[in-house]
């Protein structure tokens, strides 16, 4: 651990930073779903890249309403995938190739919709199809409104995914974009990275 210290006229400010890890041999498939927390995925990708991980990214259709493929590609220095049926790559079968390529899959933000799809084995888009075809460790960083997080169907879906061996990072309690306060906020980028 080391400290970043800044002094100013208003007093002492210090932040404890954990040492970074060397991820040179790690291949991380990063799945970004459509939620207001999608912007946080940019910082998380930056952390993984700064530590030498190789990254490929899948954007769901709704994720493209919050972040652009260009911003993701520039940070990840890798290809961004968003379509299950891409005419350019028809012979590659991206869903199988991506599931084999990855050492680990990180879904951040993991929306209530995506959590529901994954718990039911749905394969209606590239993200859910790749995860269904994968035997790699899946990490989910949930992000949704507190009422959605507390809904019984979400709780049931979480139990199912835990029984599959999926690991959850968060969510945390805090102020939400909708103006409410409660559990459902996506974990900090450093917490996702350190998991």
Annotate the PLM regions.
Residues 8-10:
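Cysteine-centered motifs
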């Amino acid at each position: 651990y080391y400290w970043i210290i800044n002094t100013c006229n208003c007093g002492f400010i210090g932040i404890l930073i954990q040492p970074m890890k060397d991820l040179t041999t790690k291949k991380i498939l990063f799945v970004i779903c459509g939620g207001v927390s999608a912007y946080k995925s940019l910082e998380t990708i930056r952390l993984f890249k700064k530590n030498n991980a190789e990254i490929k990214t899948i954007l769901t259709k709704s994720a493209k309403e919050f972040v652009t493929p260009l911003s993701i590609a520039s940070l990840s220095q890798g290809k961004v995938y968003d379509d299950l049926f891409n005419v350019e790559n028809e012979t590659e079968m991206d869903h199988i190739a991506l599931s084999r390529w990855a050492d680990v899959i990180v879904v951040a933000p993991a929306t209530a919709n995506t959590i529901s799809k994954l718990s039911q084995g749905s394969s209606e888009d590239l993200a859910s199809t790749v995860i269904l075809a994968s035997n790699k460790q899946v990490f989910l960083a949930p992000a949704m409104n507190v009422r959605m997080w507390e809904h019984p169907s979400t709780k049931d879906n979480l139990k199912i995914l835990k029984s599959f061996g999926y690991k959850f990072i968060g969510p945390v309690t805090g102020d939400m974009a909708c103006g409410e306060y409660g559990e459902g906020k996506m974990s900090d980028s450093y917490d996702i990275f350190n998991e």
